[in-house]
């Protein structure tokens, strides 16, 4: 052992090898996982800084030092306490893959302490090579790619591991599951909680872990499911996804597509991070055709980005409108890349208008003025909304801008498998193409049975807004208790009342909102990073802002002395002053002033509802304290009484809904929902129409259009009034399996797909073949450059570098898609009814709706 280690340890624990709490090495079951966790007690141990320094710079450790990092396969659980200085979960990822130790005795905590004092070496099987240990990284930093030599970037999105996942599933199987559609997966595994119950740790992981390696044979039934340690499992991009990333890094304009479960959203989030690294954070426009799709990728609608309002009028008129807005003009001038999700719902005419605006503003005649384009979507889903019923729908790929600018059109083919229903997979694929046979029809009609009645309420999807409103109102009427009515305050400079009413319908916030305790609601505006358009929740109570201020203070500090509440209850002016101080500290004065005026105007519309006592369930968080101390119990009771007093003092004030929202990572968040404002502005940014309303809508039932992009555990779909191609497919593919799906009024004659979309998909390339063709073209270009006379050729080459030639490679898949999708055979290829089910079926992936996007789980 090196002298500096011996000296340090002798200084810390002289001649007392077993008194020190140096239980710092926890090694999990299998070496192939190579997972090493550190946790130390700060009591009686002063070398925390030493250990942290070595973790930050592991390359300076010698072989003897690294013996301490043994990967013994049967370590007893040490009695560890979390490092006080290590407050965040970190991980080290390595690419080492070691064979399981053979003929090696398990190493105990006691052996380590003996080794420290006796200077006895460990076996070489317990050693790591210094060169393969990487510096510690935060959870949100890079995670490993499929290739052991490459890194891929992870996002901050989390997704809970479904508890029904089979224990014997390997990491590779999980990697191909639809659950792995999130780049960062937050796993709380019941079988590993006891082993991981040592606080937050730094973990060494390889890219080949198996979940069977994390199993604990001991009974863990007494563990609290909410106290488990969260383990980050690196999720890898597939080879075809990496190929598309490389194409984007090379500056190419790309459209990629795929059916549900092929990882479109994961790839898009990764693509956005890559582009921001290239162009800068402010120079990448992240947009989508709809508000819900935009919030899923952290962007805004394409209309909002472009500054074109509703996009009505000719291109020149819209160009002049953008020119008058300095904010939107700068956007167009500065961006380097434009990302558009759900491109399928953007019509060709609007895309050409945007192209015209970009070329004129940037004074560049290349497509979109030289802006790099990344389009994503599935044209088999909902098409663009037709403004004129007499004019046929034109898809984005039919536009002039698309034909000139988007040269790489790619089909994602690798399916990330889940615990799926194979029969349901085939049924969805046939529905996607409008190719329903007798057997598929019989299977769908069997799904008309009611769903099991449990705590999860099925989301009801309807094709029209009227059906949605009727179903939501029916559910609301069945709830007990008082109805709270919130009327919107509408305004704006527009004098044409008919036009004004039509424009107001563009706001998701309803003109009149009826709520009760227990109502299921959806947020319809982005408020912050975790509370976004599409977040689902349940109304818990109604209270005024002053009562909520006290309630929030109490939930943040349940041990708060009751004297503080007594002061606020007896002196409402002091309570109001405390609220104003906190609000002014958290917001700029201009923002705070605007929000204050919005709230005041909304509060004046109150109709003077009677004040009902707060429900006892609101105070459940205080009742969780387990104690027999009479003083503590008396304080809890006193706090409840004071809260009721403060609430009763709010008579005549506007009471707002207290909503418990459920995030995609299954965590909950209590929020008092306050009014927000919406506006459609003119070119001078003055509101033509505006609305002040709570950003909520009833959400037992949703329209099929609003459901696109969501995954729902239980779905009830009524297809009686389906009127659009792709609408039925979107609705039914929200479900994960047949067990969670109820289908009413199924009619095969209403299940259709656009022939233009089928023809377009026959021209798509695979990602791998597109990248290979690109490499081949680059080689040809390089050879020509070697024989070219020089500057003259180089100038020509440079002028064409941003417009690569179309990729003419064929796609390849396990189902024989290569033979069908020959790009040069489009004119000769004819779809026949008898070949439709076999040939076109291979165009789509064979998975049901999984974790393609951020989950919105109904409570």
Swiss-Prot record:
Pfam families: PIF1, Pif1_2B_dom. Its cofactor is Mg(2+); Mn(2+). ATP binds at residues 258-265. Residues 844-859 have a biased composition (Basic and acidic residues). Its EC number is 5.6.2.3. Residues 800-809 have a biased composition (Low complexity). GO terms for cellular component: mitochondrial inner membrane; nucleolus. It catalyses: Couples ATP hydrolysis with the unwinding of duplex DNA at the replication fork by translocating in the 5'-3' direction. This creates two antiparallel DNA single strands (ssDNA). The leading ssDNA polymer is the template for DNA polymerase III holoenzyme which synthesizes a continuous strand; ATP + H2O = ADP + phosphate + H(+). Keywords: ATP-binding, DNA damage, DNA recombination, DNA repair, DNA-binding, Helicase, Hydrolase, Isomerase, Membrane, Mitochondrion, Mitochondrion inner membrane, Nucleotide-binding, Nucleus, Phosphoprotein, Transit peptide. Induction: Cell cycle-regulated. The nuclear isoform is present in very low amounts in G1 phase cells, but increases as cells progress through S phase, with a peak in late S/G2. The mitochondrial isoform follows a similar, but less pronounced induction pattern. The nuclear isoform is prone to APC/C-dependent degradation in G1, whereas the mitochondrial isoform is not. Phosphorylated. Undergoes RAD53-dependent phosphorylation in response to loss of mtDNA. The modification Phosphoserine is found at residues 70, 72, 169, 584. InterPro entries: DNA_helicase_pif1-like_DEAD (IPR010285), P-loop_NTPase (IPR027417), Pif1-like_2B_dom (IPR049163), PIF1_helicase (IPR051055), PIF1_RRM3_pfh1 (IPR048293). Residues 727-746 bind DNA. Mg(2+). To a lesser extent, can also use Mn(2+). GO terms for molecular function: 5'-3' DNA helicase activity; ATP binding; ATP hydrolysis activity; G-quadruplex DNA binding; telomerase inhibitor activity. Residues 142-183, 782-859 are annotated as: Disordered. Transmembrane segments: none annotated. Belongs to the helicase family. PIF1 subfamily. Monomer in solution. DNA binding induces dimerization. Associates with mitochondrial and telomeric DNA. Binding to mtDNA is non-specific and the protein seems to coat the entire mtDNA molecule. Binds to the telomerase RNA TLC1. Interacts with the mitochondrial single-strand DNA-binding protein RIM1. DNA-dependent ATPase and 5'-3' DNA helicase required for the maintenance of both mitochondrial and nuclear genome stability. Efficiently unwinds G-quadruplex (G4) DNA structures and forked RNA-DNA hybrids. Appears to move along DNA in single nucleotide or base pair steps, powered by hydrolysis of 1 molecule of ATP. Processes at an unwinding rate of about 75 bp/s. Resolves G4 structures, preventing replication pausing and double-strand breaks (DSBs) at G4 motifs. Involved in the maintenance of telomeric DNA. This is ATP-dependent DNA helicase PIF1. It comes from Saccharomyces cerevisiae (strain YJM789) (Baker's yeast).
């Amino acid at each position: 052992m090196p002298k500096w280690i011996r000296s340090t340890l002798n200084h810390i624990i002289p001649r007392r090898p077993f008194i020190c709490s140096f239980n710092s090495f926890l090694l999990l079951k299998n070496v192939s996982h190579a997972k090493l966790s550190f946790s130390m007690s700060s009591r009686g141990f002063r070398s925390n800084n030493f250990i942290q320094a070595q973790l930050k710079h592991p390359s300076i450790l010698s072989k003897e030092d690294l013996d301490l990092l043994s990967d013994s396969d049967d370590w007893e659980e040490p009695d560890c306490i979390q490092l006080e200085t290590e407050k965040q979960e970190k991980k080290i990822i390595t690419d080492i893959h070691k064979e399981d130790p053979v003929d090696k005795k398990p190493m105990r905590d006691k052996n380590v302490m003996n080794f420290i004092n006796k200077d006895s070496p460990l076996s070489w099987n317990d050693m790591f090579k210094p060169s393969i240990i990487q510096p510690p990284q935060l959870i949100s930093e890079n995670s490993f790619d499929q290739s052991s030599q490459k890194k891929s970037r992870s996002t901050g999105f989390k997704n809970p591991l479904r508890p029904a996942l089979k224990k014997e599933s390997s990491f590779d199987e999980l990697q191909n599951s639809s659950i792995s559609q999130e780049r960062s997966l937050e796993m709380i595994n019941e079988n590993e909680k006891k082993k991981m119950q040592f606080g937050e740790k730094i973990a060494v992981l390889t890219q080949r872990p198996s979940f069977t390696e994390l199993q604990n044979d001991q009974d863990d039934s007494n563990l609290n499911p909410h106290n488990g340690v969260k383990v980050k499992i690196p999720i890898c991009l597939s080879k075809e996804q990496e190929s598309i990333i490389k194409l984007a890094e090379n500056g190419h304009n790309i459209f990629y597509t795929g059916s549900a479960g092929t990882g479109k959203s994961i790839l898009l989030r990764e693509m956005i991070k890559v582009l921001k690294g290239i162009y800068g954070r402010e120079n990448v426009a992240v947009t989508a055709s709809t508000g819900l799709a935009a919030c899923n990728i952290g962007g805004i609608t394409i209309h909002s980005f472009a500054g074109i309002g509703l996009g009505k009028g000719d291109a020149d008129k819209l160009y002049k409108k953008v020119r008058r807005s300095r904010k939107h003009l700068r956007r167009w001038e500065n961006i380097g890349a434009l990302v558009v999700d759900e491109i399928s719902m953007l019509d060709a005419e609007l895309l050409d208008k945007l192209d015209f605006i970009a070329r004129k503003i940037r004074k560049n005649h290349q497509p979109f003025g030289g802006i790099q384009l990344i389009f994503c979507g599935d044209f088999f889903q909902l098409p663009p909304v037709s403004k004129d019923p007499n004019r046929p729908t034109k898809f984005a790929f039919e536009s002039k801008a698309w034909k000139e600018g988007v040269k790489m059109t790619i089909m994602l083919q690798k399916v990330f498998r889940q615990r799926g229903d194979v029969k349901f997979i085939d049924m969805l694929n046939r529905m996607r193409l409008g190719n329903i046979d007798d057997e598929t029809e019989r299977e769908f009609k069997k799904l008309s049975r009611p769903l099991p009645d449990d705590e999860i309420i099925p989301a009801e999807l309807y094709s029209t807004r009227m059906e949605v409103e009727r179903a939501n109102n029916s559910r609301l009427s069945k709830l007990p208790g008082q109805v709270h009515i919130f009327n919107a305050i509408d305004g704006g400079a527009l004098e044409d009342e008919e036009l004004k009413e039509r424009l107001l319908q563009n706001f998701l916030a309803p003109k009149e909102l009826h709520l009760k305790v227990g109502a299921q609601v959806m947020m319809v505006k982005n408020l912050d990073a975790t509370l976004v358009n599409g977040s689902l929740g349940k109304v818990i109570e109604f209270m005024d802002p002053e009562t909520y201020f006290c309630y929030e203070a109490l939930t943040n500090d349940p041990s708060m002395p009751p004297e503080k509440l007594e002061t606020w209850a007896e002196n409402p002016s002091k309570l109001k002053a405390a609220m104003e101080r906190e609000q002014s500290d958290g917001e700029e004065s201009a923002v705070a002033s605007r929000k204050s005026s919005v709230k005041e105007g909304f509060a004046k519309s109150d109709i003077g509802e009677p004040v009902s006592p707060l429900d006892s369930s609101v105070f459940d968080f205080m009742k969780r304290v387990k104690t027999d101390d009479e003083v503590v119990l008396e304080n809890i009771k006193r706090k409840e009484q004071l809260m009721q007093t403060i609430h009763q003092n709010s008579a005549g004030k506007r009471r707002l809904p207290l909503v418990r929202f459920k995030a995609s990572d299954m965590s909950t968040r209590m929020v008092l929902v306050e009014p927000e404002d919406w506006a459609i502005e003119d070119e001078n940014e003055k509101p033509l129409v505006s609305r002040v309303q709570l950003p909520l809508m009833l959400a037992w039932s949703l329209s099929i259009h609003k459901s696109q992009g969501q995954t729902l555990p239980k779905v009830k779909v009524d297809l009686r009034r389906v009127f659009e191609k792709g609408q039925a497919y979107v609705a039914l593919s929200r479900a994960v399996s047949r067990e969670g799906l109820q289908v009413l009024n199924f009619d095969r004659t209403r299940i259709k797909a656009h022939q233009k979309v089928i023809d377009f998909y026959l021209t798509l390339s695979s990602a791998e073949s597109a990248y290979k063709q690109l490499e081949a073209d680059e080689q040809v270009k390089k050879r020509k450059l070697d024989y070219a006379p020089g500057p003259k050729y180089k100038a020509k080459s440079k002028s064409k570098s941003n417009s690569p030639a179309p990729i003419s490679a064929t796609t390849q898949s396990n189902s024989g898609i290569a033979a069908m999708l020959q790009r040069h055979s489009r004119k000769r290829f004819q779809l026949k009814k008898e070949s439709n089910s076999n040939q076109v079926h291979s165009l789509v992936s064979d998975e049901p709706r999984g974790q393609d996007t951020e989950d919105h789980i109904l409570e």
